[in-house]
Amino acid sequence: MSATVEFARMNGLGNKILVVDMRGRPDKVTPAAAVALNADPQTEFDQIMAIHDPKADGTDAFIDILNSDGSKAQACGNGTRCVVQALAAETGRKAFTFQTVAGILNAVEHEDGTISVDMGRPVFDWNRIPLAEEFHDTSRIELQIGPIDNPVLHSPSAMSMGNPHAIFWVDRDVMSYDLARFGPLLENHPMFPERANITLAQVTSPTSMTTRTWERGAGLTLACGSAACSAAVSAARTGRTGRKVTINVASAKPPATLSIEWRERDDHVIMTGPAEWEWSGSLDPSTGLWSRDGTQEAGAR
């Protein structure tokens, strides 16, 4: 078995993704390799999407997802779109079914190059998100940061899209908040026993909103698909918008929009957006040592 595997540097709305082909191998991308790859500016990433042979009948692959700190992630919508684009280019197919630790994802590439991912049903039960305290209604939980009489952020909506999310509703530009300061405090708040993705959301119309996310295990990120889905669902759930919205991702290079629909007929959340290939190479999944195709560049030694 070769020590190296093929990988592609891709992005979904700027969300930095490494798609790693682990098919035909029993091993996995190690946390140490992930940390080494993220330490190199050329391979710095938000998520690794490792494609493994399918484990379940009717699926095309099992996707193992790692954060930039080496921890496991249950879901990554932007990364899933990148996997679809890579496999569509390889096979000529347009529709795929993936298994992750969070469940089954169905995805399709459209003629215009955008990709839709069925992210499944949202979860609202406090003990399944999970939260450390019982809440009958998780559309507004008791949590704030800042002075008691004048909090900077407060009363988020909490839910899971396969991973825990807290959506804080704000009434001014999401980029005006010091999320680099507040993000780690909220991600690791005792309310979230498995940590959480933290999103600031500003509703701009009944069909549009703007978001910015501190991603669990990755930090400030240009985009987060599952966070966009969670913001859209939470906005509809609290009556701020309808069930179909356009998400403007504030931290990504414009135009940076995702279309999110929380389907009424089956409660599934459908995310549609772009994916972009940047370059390819090979890497050692145990150490993170890598080289770029067509060059002598190498890193993560």
Swiss-Prot record:
The record marks 165, 215 as: Could be important to modulate the pK values of the two catalytic cysteine residues. It is found in: Cytoplasm. Gene3D superfamilies: Diaminopimelate Epimerase, Chain A, domain 1. The active site is at 76 (proton donor), 224 (proton acceptor). GO terms for cellular component: cytosol. Pathway: Amino-acid biosynthesis; L-lysine biosynthesis via DAP pathway; DL-2,6-diaminopimelate from LL-2,6-diaminopimelate: step 1/1. GO terms for biological process: lysine biosynthetic process via diaminopimelate. It is an enzyme of class 5 (isomerase). It comes from the Bacteria. GO terms for molecular function: diaminopimelate epimerase activity. It catalyses: (2S,6S)-2,6-diaminopimelate = meso-2,6-diaminopimelate. Substrate binds at residues 15, 47, 67, 77-78, 163, 197, 215-216, 225-226. Its EC number is 5.1.1.7. Keywords: Amino-acid biosynthesis, Cytoplasm, Isomerase, Lysine biosynthesis. It holds the Pfam family DAP_epimerase. Homodimer. Catalyzes the stereoinversion of LL-2,6-diaminopimelate (L,L-DAP) to meso-diaminopimelate (meso-DAP), a precursor of L-lysine and an essential component of the bacterial peptidoglycan. This is Diaminopimelate epimerase. The gene is dapF.
